[in-house]
């Protein structure tokens, strides 16, 4: 009997929170995996150290100006160094069985599509991929016999609750939200909230940008759109509930009145491990819930005045086309301006809505055929329009 073939894996966004948790799981069983590609951003030391430890074929930094540093850090390791958007796509096109897509933002779309085109299972932690180009991504997966598995904790929870179920029997999907750093702040205080304050998540250990998106609930707005794309459910049947403990990740309601809930400690290794080992379940190094110690779980409806991003997500789902790409790009650029201290916390939603309104005034842009090029062009234009709106404010 021959030896079992190693499973070829790639991790895009390897130096971020999701990527590091994925590496943690893979490193516990290194003899089972052949690491093809790792990608990261500016943290060259971490990227190089992980590439050496996992003996990756190639390590890619998103920043071309850091290629020299990456090559120096990998000297003598036998790991190839590459940099820039084209290198990310080339790495995604390298044959792999399983690919983690954890690059933050729209930059994850092109390498994700490349992975699908070579038939890989794409573990999707990059929610922007479906928000910006859901129809394109799903059609690419279908055409090439590839598979998409959710890694967001909410969508993984829904996916697990639906095992063996008929989507026709699903009445509603409920995704939970912690409410973020400001969930209990008085509304009048939000205008003075800083990026540093927004980056303090009460439950999850995540990067700065996604933690701020949690505070504004732009993160949840993206997840609502992703739920529609991933599960093909009518937007009117997707609900959001604020759940401060972050122990219930999602619920699925059925037409017989049953409500199936998925519970687990707030540890992303749950969802990552499920996607990594699917369709099996294997032991994971995560805390087990002690319900008696937990005592109680709390839920409340989100406040529309506090979280206008949810209303904008509903508009995007109703509008369709390339509006998701506009929404995401405008959100990302508005977040840049908030982090830089140029706008207030409450200004982000207004800026995003203004850009959506401007695109709606020229519907030919939103209704253009969805291709990688049109998504990319729309993304760039939306960012430019955010900057133009900022310049107008300053003038």
Curated annotation (Swiss-Prot):
Where, by residue number, does the polypeptide cross the bilayer? none
This enzyme's EC code(s): 1.1.1.267
Residues bound to 1-deoxy-D-xylulose 5-phosphate are 127, 153-154, 178, 201, 214, 219-220, 223
Molecular function per GO: 1-deoxy-D-xylulose-5-phosphate reductoisomerase activity; manganese ion binding; NADPH binding
Q: Where is the signal peptide?
A: none
InterPro entries, alphabetically? Answer: DXP_reductoisomerase, DXP_reductoisomerase_C, DXP_reductoisomerase_N, DXPR_C, DXPR_C_sf, NAD(P)-bd_dom_sf
- Superkingdom of this entry's organism? Bacteria
Q: Which reaction does it catalyse?
A: 2-C-methyl-D-erythritol 4-phosphate + NADP(+) = 1-deoxy-D-xylulose 5-phosphate + NADPH + H(+)
Query: Which positions does UniProt annotate for Mn(2+) binding?
Result: 152, 154, 223
Q: Which residues of this UniProt protein bind NADPH? A: 15-18, 41, 43, 126, 128, 207
Which of the seven top EC classes does this enzyme belong to?
A: oxidoreductase
Summary of the function given for this chain in its UniProt record: Catalyzes the NADPH-dependent rearrangement and reduction of 1-deoxy-D-xylulose-5-phosphate (DXP) to 2-C-methyl-D-erythritol 4-phosphate (MEP).
**Name of the protein:** 1-deoxy-D-xylulose 5-phosphate reductoisomerase
Give the source species: Ruegeria pomeroyi (strain ATCC 700808 / DSM 15171 / DSS-3) (Silicibacter pomeroyi)
Primary gene name: dxr
